[in-house]
Amino acid sequence: MKELQLPEKRKSNTGLSWFPSPRILQVFLVLLGAIVAFLSFSATSSIISSSPKHHSCHDNVEEAAVKYHYSTISSDELPISNERLASLGLTPNQPVKITDIGGKEKSIKGRFLHITDMHPDLYYKENTSIDDTCHRGKPKNDGDRAARFGNAMKGCDGPPDLMYYTLDWIHKNLSDEIDFIIWTGDNVRHDNDRRIPRTEQQIFDMNRQVSELFLKTFKDHESDDPRDLKVKIIPSLGNNDVFPHNLFSPGPTLQTRELYDIWSQFIPPAQQNTFDRYASFFVEAIPGKLAVISLNTLYMFKGNPLVDNCSNKKQPGYKMLLWVGFTLQELRDRGMKVWLSGHVPPIPKNFDSSCSDKLALWLHEYSDIIIGGFYGHMNMDHFIPVDGEKAWDDIANSMAISEYSGFFEQDFLEDAIAAREIRAEGAKPVKKVNYMNGVRDAYYSRISEDVKKLSEKDPLYERYSIVHIGTSIIPTFNPGFRIWEYNITELQTEEEVLHSHQPWDSFFEHLDVEIQKIIEEAEEAEEVEAFEDDEQIDSEIPDVLISKKKKKKGKKGKKNKNSKNWWKTDKTFPKKKPKNLPPGPAYENQLFSPLRFVQYYADLKEIDKQYLKLLKEGKSEDEAASIAFKYQIEYASDDKPYPMKTTLVKDYIELASELSGNDKLWDTFLERAFCSSGYED
């Protein structure tokens, strides 16, 4: 088997040539990791052994004080001028310096990056035929020629140089101005070349190499700790990051263990067992203040045939939602705020209804701490408003057919189309305008009339959460990524923050026991009622298939049989949000509220034109590439023709209402959704 490795030919061109080879670095990091793991285990063991054993996640909480000092940074300490920030479209602000109890300092800038779907293809060859997946063959004409950095809308995966130069551009221009990176997966080529089928080992190798590139690019080279990064990185698992694509079994498995090894420098050590089970974790982006949860969306994904739903207690999606619930409650108890992230967006097109509805409930009932969510997979820049109140209604109706809920309510034609898309994995866009028009009709238009009735502070805005879906690096359209700006003004007023909570390793130790206990009790209860439930379901299935009317009657009967408070006994459903909790950062401008964003893109057609011109002028390949390749501002959230005051939920709901009724605005929105590539169906 051909061993995959980062190509040597053009490494020096990226500005990252000072890195050691991936294999040497891997051995070095493994040795260091073993030492660090041993020391961490020793320290953790002493803490646990001296602590009282807990019977639940919140009883007899152990005190663990961690102190942080916050101070503003003077203008002469700023790493970049206001003029430079303005040229990048960013808002100058006053960074905040955090000093922990050990004296370690970190500067908080109030910005972060969302990047997704790079799909680097090490078999990509410049000047080959696009029709032959950019792997081989002589181009039939200039339109069939594989460009060095890729061709928008042509269907090939990303050239390695596109990934290298993208990260290098971010490193040179933005790495000193962001606090963390949300990286939502798909780091491996598609399985779209029958002559070079993907293998499991190749997928592991590619995930490792891309992870190492992120580590090298954003490492804190002033620190002696190999785990220290200039910015924190929160990766998520993509449906093409596994073998075979889309298929991901309940953990622990070889894949979850191998992925933990690959991402061990991104994942807090206390969460290793959690990752082994769910391939999910979270990171404190700002210690004690702001967290980012990485969800393994493959356990909820319709395209994964190894999982079914989030209703059956044996399903990994159900178990992962238990983890989500306990984790969110702990973050709320600690007074923290949180972003969610994952690869596949949690919408009905992608998720089983029991999964998308339940996740919508958590977004809604924990809206005092959840700011929103970032996802990839779709390759298009757009947003989906998720209605939490509607999710409660959908769940109540679907429970009538127990674990068959959602199955018979699905649009079978839509599922057939989705299945066809899954089989034909690739980068070429197909019927994307049709999809976006569906988003407009299904989401934006349906809320338009309600929005017109709302007052400035109407609580109905709080029924919605926003799912942000990012542009990809792979040239499905033009490559793009986004920088978000968020509120840090209140950090400047806090002299000290004292946290008294159980250590995270203690929390997760007891959480594992708690979840296992819940699962065992639920499975025992199901076994007792299994025979009766099977008879009930068997009698309902023919009615459902014959008539929707009969199905609804069947649902009504089953619902009457159950307690009206059935959701209170199932911990994958959240408790109602206490009425005394104020609106969170997604709804009112406060600490960590998202204020605006800047969308960057690479105009591949113009880059290739400039690159070829420079070659003709006598420049070397590396010189021409360094000059030609660049990202530029595509637009900012406050740009015309639909400038947003902020990027709170209210602003998105009002934008959705505007887009539903204004075709001219919609045309601009579509142009931006397709990253200024000129795409049309």
Swiss-Prot record:
Top-rank lineage group of the source organism: Eukaryota
UniProt-listed Enzyme Commission number(s): 3.6.1.10
Ranges facing Vacuolar side: 45-681
Topology of the protein relative to the lipid bilayer: Single-pass type II membrane protein
Biased composition regions of type Basic residues, renumbered to the chain: 549-562
Free-text description of this protein's post-translational modifications in UniProt: Processing by proteases in the vacuole may be required for activation.
Reaction catalyzed: [phosphate](n+1) + n H2O = (n+1) phosphate + n H(+)
Record InterPro entries: ASMase/PPN1_MPP, Calcineurin-like_PHP_ApaH, EndopolyPtase_N1, Metallo-depent_PP-like
The keyword Transmembrane appears for this protein: yes
Transit peptide listed as a keyword: no
Cofactor(s) this protein cannot do without: a divalent metal cation
Transmembrane spans: 24-44
Residue positions with a glycan: 127, 173, 309, 487
GO-annotated biological processes: polyphosphate catabolic process
Enzymatic class: hydrolase
Localization, UniProt: Vacuole membrane
Gene Ontology molecular functions: endopolyphosphatase activity; exopolyphosphatase activity; phosphoric diester hydrolase activity
Stretches of the chain found on the membrane's Cytoplasmic side: 1-23
Renumbered residue ranges of the record's region Disordered: 549-585
Keywords: Glycoprotein, Hydrolase, Membrane, Signal-anchor, Transmembrane, Transmembrane helix, Vacuole
Gene Ontology, cellular component aspect: fungal-type vacuole; vacuolar membrane
Family the UniProt entry places it in: Belongs to the endopolyphosphatase PPN1 family.
Function in brief: Catalyzes the hydrolysis of inorganic polyphosphate (polyP) chains of many hundreds of phosphate residues into shorter lengths.
Protein name: Endopolyphosphatase
